[in-house]
Curated annotation (Swiss-Prot):
<protein>
    <recommendedName>
        <fullName>Large ribosomal subunit protein bL27</fullName>
    </recommendedName>
</protein>
<dbReference type="GO" id="GO:0003735">
    <property type="term" value="F:structural constituent of ribosome"/>
</dbReference>
<keyword id="KW-0687">Ribonucleoprotein</keyword>
<dbReference type="GO" id="GO:0006412">
    <property type="term" value="P:translation"/>
</dbReference>
<dbReference type="InterPro" id="IPR001684">
    <property type="entry name" value="Ribosomal_bL27"/>
</dbReference>
<feature type="region of interest" description="Disordered">
    <location>
        <begin position="1"/>
        <end position="25"/>
    </location>
</feature>
<keyword id="KW-0689">Ribosomal protein</keyword>
<dbReference type="GO" id="GO:0022625">
    <property type="term" value="C:cytosolic large ribosomal subunit"/>
</dbReference>
<dbReference type="Pfam" id="PF01016">
    <property type="entry name" value="Ribosomal_L27"/>
</dbReference>
<comment type="similarity">
    <text>Belongs to the bacterial ribosomal protein bL27 family.</text>
</comment>
Length: 83
């Protein structure tokens, strides 16, 4: 049995493309309706007041306003409306 694979048989060089997950907006920042706040897999951050959740668990703003984050047993993201 050959213990060499032959020329040109590269075994390395594979890596998946990054998915750019995480917070897109910090607490205290101003956002507009529809702005993406968090991209995530599962619910690391949970939607609270004026925040919607997409089918891929993305959190987005339902109103214009300021982002507020609150940590209890879970981390909640909400948007306080601004005039």
């Amino acid at each position: 049995m050959a213990h060499k694979k032959g020329q040109g048989a590269s075994r390395n060089g594979r890596d998946s493309e990054s998915k750019r997950l995480g917070l897109k907006v910090g607490a205290g920042q101003r956002v507009s309706t529809g702005s993406i706040l968090v991209r995530q897999r599962g619910t690391k951050w949970h939607p609270a007041v004026n925040v919607g959740r997409g089918k891929d668990d993305t959190l987005f703003a339902l109103v214009d306003g300021i982002v507020v984050m609150k940590k209890t047993d879970r981390t909640y993201v909400s948007v306080i409306p601004q005039a």
